[in-house]
Amino acid sequence: MDKKWWKEAVVYQIYPRSFMDSNGDGIGDLNGITSRLDYLKDLGVDVIWLSPVYQSPNDDNGYDISDYRAIMQEFGTMEDFDRMLSEMHKRGIRLVMDLVVNHTSDEHKWFVESRKSKDNPYRDYYIWRDAKEGKEPNNWGSCFSGSPWKYDPQTEMYYLHLFSTKQPDLNWENPAVRKEVFDMMNWWCEKGIDGFRMDVISMISKPEGLPDGKIPEGGLYGDSGCVNGPHVHEYLQEMNREVLSKYDLMTVGECAGVTIEEAEKYASADGKELSMVFQFELVDLASGTYGKWTDKRVPLKDFKRVMTAWQTELEGKAWNSLFLGNHDQPRCLSRFGDDSPEYRVVSAKMLATCLHMMQGTPYVYQGDELGMKNVPFHDLSEFRDIESINAFHELTGAGKVAPDDMMRYLNLRGRDNARTPMQWDDTASAGFTTGTPWIKVGPDYETVNAKNEMADPDSVYNYYKKLIHLRKEKDIMVYGTYELLDPEDEALYVYTRTLGDQKLLVMCNFTKEEQEYTVPETFAGAEVLISNYPQDGAAAGVRKLRAYEAVVLETK
């Protein structure tokens, strides 16, 4: 059993724009985060993953970086950052920074130079191509709708941007680019940060020759083939040699489209690349003709199949990261649970139990520990997310989706659901700001807020606190092997964890109907470790699991 601090940690993701505003401008900031560190210490988390706070024109909420060694003015100064880091470390909390190096902002000095002329020293920092028969160099589609090629009249060539037009892709084939990135990473490590979460890192290596891609049925553009490109592992191993191996870091790669076999390469136990990856097979379930824009729910059998494959097939080979939501996903409670007032609390606790009892490093997205849910958006003007707004115009404009249907899809699946302000108390704007918040506040903030949750011993917050505390006490939660029971059951998710002669049985009812379950004989005499309902009576035999009930039994 190869023990590591990051395997035993619980990570809390902060989306800084929406966490806490200290100066009344309606935008969360670094001093706001510092002011709330005692809350996170009380919750018990070990690591904070901070979404980008670098200098940025903010075309894509900070994922378009114009200076990697400066802080976005809306968020504060480098002095504010240094103080925040110091205060985290005083409380025993580590900091993982978001690293965005597939692309920069078009306002980064490298790109400003690159576009000036074809012989500029920075020209090959980016990917430039001539037109093909008067059109884009190939048929690829951008991740944010439309073509990923933008014509630049200055040099009469196109540059590649897999995301927005203001996010030109870096040319990782150029050794000078890699050196710049590694130097910058070392600079942050010397400041004392504890790791990196690497944005779309599986896309940094482009296919040789940038050929046309296959157009999916009903689609408008070809697949770029940039996921898990030909040199991605080479580049990450070089990054590991030049930066990561010199420090005691936690590294996680955001790897959309990654298979279990690929994940083994990215996060192999031999430590040559990353600590772990984010896989999106679970959150990409129930996609439709237009990708995520659908109202389909994820069938529990599919949920179990995906979670189980990653649990069992990476066992002993690589490490899992466990998450049901983040800043790019709708609220996990609304997506996988039941956010109605009647079941909000029990189903939020059930989802947390199901996730935190698995093998891997759990991630808590800000507000999930309060049972925050999707927020109703009634008009396109209320959205702030470039992805949602672009998708609305593209799909309704092409006559593919009716506007009312598209609004429903945006409400169910849009990224702004996770980006509404953190609900601290029942005062105006949920205590997030004394000014006007940059995006609307959830309408339920008067009841669902941190102040209420902390005061109520039976709250979602205090349940998360228990789960996080248990992980520190119970090696079996971290290192035990996983086995799924009853894979075909469409209502219950039941699995075991085993470490030596210790065993846990995790039972989760994913429905609001009562479900019967026969507890295996091996758990006769077992005790309840944690549950989201009061428990009585014997552990073994037939149990009736109430609406969204979760029970964990432990053999001694």
Which residues does each PLM region occupy?
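Active-site and adjacent substrate-binding regions of carbohydrate-active enzymes
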Residues: 1-556
